Amino acid sequence: MLLVKMTTTIFYADDLLQALQQAKAEKNFSSVFSLDWDKLRIAKRNTSVKYVTVNVTVKGKKAPLMFSFQNEKHVGTIPPSTDEEVIRMNAENPKFLVKRRDRDPCLQFNKYKISPPLEDDGLTVKKNEQGEEIYPGDEEKSKLFQIIELLEEAFEDAVQKGPETMKTKNIIKLVQRKISSSAIKNADKPLPNPIARIRIKVNPTTTMLAPILLDKNKPITLQNGKTSFEELKDEDGTKANPDNIHKLIESHSIHDGIINARSICISNMGISFPLCLEMGVVKVFEKNNGIDVDSIYGSDDITNLINQVAIA
């Protein structure tokens, strides 16, 4: 594990995944994942919102949860934040209309790196001769998605073992497995390739993106001789911001990063577990010729989970 500033522990994805998998096998998520219920923190901007620290124990080290990930493929379109961009994007691609984004942008990751074979409807997974649905093998599963899926289980387990007042609250899922019940088409149908999302927070004071975003296509050498990357910028040299992020992070771009998952959030919406990007490195590469996720999930469907995310 990597230590930053001597006070922040960032767990490696491999170590965290192994610890969570072992805890699940032993039916003992408490050995890895815990919530500090005794130290509720009240949000500065909204006193009805409270936070509880998330701790994990990996290889004997206990710390608030932050972890790194590598080589994960973002899928789908980040909606624009301005009406002008909505008009432009819909004119360029009228088949897949977008709406103006009214919340923080998110990175999206599928469970499988490749799509399961689908029927002509683009949603139903094909079956083999035995009548079993055909899914990609374990080697095609996203490591980050596996971690998030296990964190969801550990989170729900910890809430059920927590104070009685918490057990009756709505627990907001980390993974979207179905199309929105309010969708005009295919409402409540299972997604063939479930989605997990990482929030890219916008600082409410500065209105700028909170995480540092770097461009892996543009390496630089630091004064200490180590390699880093230039900050992510658009064609005009403007750094990544809420108004241009949808242009800079395209579907099928590859991401490394650090996720801040140090707190759960308790609000009138229920209990959520915000996963926020602390730092990201983006590598854009040529899009493949496979099925575009936007042809499977409409803009309303892929933003359904974000509508539920509590204030973080």
Swiss-Prot record:
Induction: Expressed in the early phase of the viral replicative cycle.
Compartments where found: Virion
Organism: African swine fever virus (isolate Tick/Malawi/Lil 20-1/1983)
GO cellular component: virion component
Domain of life (superkingdom): Viruses
Full protein name: Uncharacterized protein CP312R
Keyword entries, A-Z: Early protein, Virion
Entry similarity comment: Belongs to the asfivirus CP312R family.
